A protein has these predicted regions:
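Glycine-rich, flexible N-terminal cofactor/catalytic loop recognition
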Residues: 1-57
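Conserved helicase motor
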Residues: 54-61, 134-136
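Glycine/small-residue-rich loop that forms an oxyanion/phosphate-binding "nest" at active or ligand-binding sites
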Residues: 56, 64-113
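A contiguous loop/helix-start segment that scaffolds small-molecule binding in enzyme catalytic cores
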Residues: 154, 158-262
Length: 262
């Protein structure tokens, strides 16, 4: 029986590639790549001449069965994404799950991912955090934010430059304008930059200065006083009501109003 290797690749600087990753990519029987053209540049840089097969979110359900069959037949196979660690906001989970079900050994190498450097650099608490990845693009986007409004842990999001300002503005309204955050762009690349501030100040900054590049957004968690105050406000009866909580809280009504504009 073969082995499936999950290989992180640099998110920017080629020097972030590990010796072990290079060795395994040279030794395996097959490399699965999210985009063979993009990965081809990386592989040529490290003189890795090996068979490549496309494996991405549009075909992973179809190709995983054949890949598992090859693994069961004794082939050693490596999976890489365009950048970072497969399975983290990239294809990988489905294949790993199917390989595990089939009893195949799976080894994931430690290595590059964009959110860990961004989290540590942000200056926000990183002892406990919630990785949220990409928010829904359309319907449900603000609803998801509302669900996270009372999250006490530091939150990590991936975002596109064209949606960043709107996201910051929505978060300022839902989480609070003074919530601390950090926008990290182009991690491990030439123009790497991290800007810290409140959600409202960051929204203003990027309204005036167009954001570019790949973005990791780090948002501080809600403090205990804010959570308790919001919960108390939601359960405060209106004039003429009994002490029983309202059927729908102010917070719930706000959620419904925002859902209509998602």
């Amino acid at each position: 029986m073969g082995t499936l290797y999950i290989i992180p690749t640099p998110v920017g600087n080629m020097e972030d590639m590990t010796f072990r990753a290079i060795r395994i990519l040279k030794e395996v029987d097959l490399i699965l790549a999210e985009d063979t053209r993009t990965s081809g540049i990386l592989l040529r840089h490290f003189d890795i001449d090996n068979r490549l097969m496309s494996h991405h979110k549009f075909n992973e359900h179809e190709t995983s069965a054949s890949v598992v069959k090859r693994l069961l037949g004794g082939e050693n196979i490596a999976l890489i994404s365009d950048a970072g660690t497969p399975g983290i906001s990239d294809p990988g989970f489905f294949l790993v799950r199917e390989a595990v079900k089939a009893g195949v050994d799976v080894y994931t190498l430690p290595g590059a991912t964009a959110f860990v450097p961004a989290l540590v650099t942000s200056g926000l608490p990183c002892d406990r955090f919630a990785f949220e990845g990409f928010l829904p693009q359309k319907k449900g986007r603000q609803t998801k934010m509302i669900q996270l409004a009372d999250e006490r842990r530091t939150m990590i999001f991936y975002e596109s430059p064209r949606r960043l300002v709107k996201t910051l503005q929505q978060m300022a309204e839902i989480f609070g304008a003074d919530r601390q955050a950090c926008v990290c762009r182009e991690i491990s690349k030439v123009h790497e930059d991290c800007r810290r501030g409140t959600l409202s100040s960051l929204a203003l900054h990027f309204t005036q200065e167009e954001p570019r590049g790949e973005i990791v957004l780090i948002v501080g968690g809600a403090d205990a006083d804010t959570v308790m105050s919001r919960q108390a406000d939601d359960n405060t009866p209106e004039d003429g009501e009994t002490t029983k909580p309202r059927r729908k809280s102010k917070y719930q009504l706000k959620q419904e109003r925002l859902e209509e504009t998602d």
